[in-house]
């Protein structure tokens, strides 16, 4: 399932105009987040705010004991914070 999230994030980057993609997948009580970037947005910095890590254009995080909607809200906040600080 986590591999599917990574593939989904990769696939979303092929959509015209998409600079970064985030895919979420819940397994048991953990939400797995896979992120990819075209190189203009540092997804590593965004997912570090959720306890994850990786590389500038490819990163991941696991949010334990969370619903998908709660993890998504937290992710949106991290993205908004990143954009306010960096763009």
Which sequence ranges carry the predicted segments?
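Gly/His-enriched, cation/cofactor- and phosphate-binding structural elements
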Residues: 1-87
């Amino acid at each position: 399932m986590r591999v599917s999230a990574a593939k989904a994030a990769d696939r979303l980057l092929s959509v015209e105009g998409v600079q970064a993609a985030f895919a979420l997948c819940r397994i048991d009580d953990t939400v797995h987040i896979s992120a990819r970037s075209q190189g203009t947005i540092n997804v590593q910095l965004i997912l570090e705010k959720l306890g994850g890590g990786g590389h500038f254009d490819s990163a991941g995080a696991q949010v334990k004991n969370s619903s998908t909607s709660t993890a998504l809200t937290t992710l949106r906040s991290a993205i908004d914070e990143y954009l306010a600080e960096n763009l």
